[in-house]
A protein has these predicted regions:
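C-terminal binding/interaction regions
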Residues: 2-22, 73-142
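Short, well-ordered amphipathic alpha-helical segments that serve as non-catalytic structural scaffolds
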Residues: 15-18, 60-68
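Short Gly/Pro-enriched turn/cap motifs at secondary-structure boundaries
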Residues: 25-27
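Short beta-strand scaffold segments in enzyme catalytic cores
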Residues: 29-37
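Alpha-helix C-terminal capping segments
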Residues: 37, 67-73
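Compact, glycine-rich, soluble single-domain proteins
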Residues: 48-60
Length: 142
């Protein structure tokens, strides 16, 4: 059961879908959009940005997180992630391992929600703990 209302879920999904238009993915043609909801209600967006060197690529989720953190925001409730080959979405796209690790840095794994969607009507919601059950985070270094 989500802590978000249906209208907010749909808003995040539609925003993430729209962010795919800004994706720079000339090598994979796998376009990803993200919409990150901060605890203060602000939505930070991101898209994936590829590079011929591959290593310097950045995922949509990290783009959204880094955008928020660069503006002083470090508390979050949820993120919506959508992705697939150029064109209409046909399947769910989950965050990669690096993005899950970034989420562990800033989010409570028991309450932070990850929405993976195909359309505003077809989506799944998981907690970070469900998606990354043995995640390593700041508490492990305390």
């Amino acid at each position: 059961m989500s802590n978000l209302n249906e209208a907010k879920i749909k808003e995040l999904i539609e925003t993430a879908i729209g962010m795919r238009n800004y994706s720079y993915a000339p090598y994979s043609n796998f376009k990803v959009g993200a919409a990150l909801l901060a605890k203060n209600g602000t939505v930070y967006t991101g898209c994936n940005v590829e590079n011929a060197g591959y290593t310097p690529c950045n995922c949509a989720e990290r783009t959204a997180f880094f955008k928020a953190v660069s503006e002083g925001v470090k508390e979050f409730d949820a993120i919506c992630v959508v992705g697939g080959k150029e064109g209409p979405l046909t399947d769910f796209a989950a965050p990669c391992g690096v993005c899950r690790q970034v989420m562990m840095e800033f989010c409570d794994p028991d309450t932070f929600e990850i929405i993976v969607a195909i359309t505003p009507e077809e989506y799944k919601i998981l907690t970070l703990k469900e998606l990354f059950p043995m995640g390593f985070g700041p508490a492990d270094l305390a």
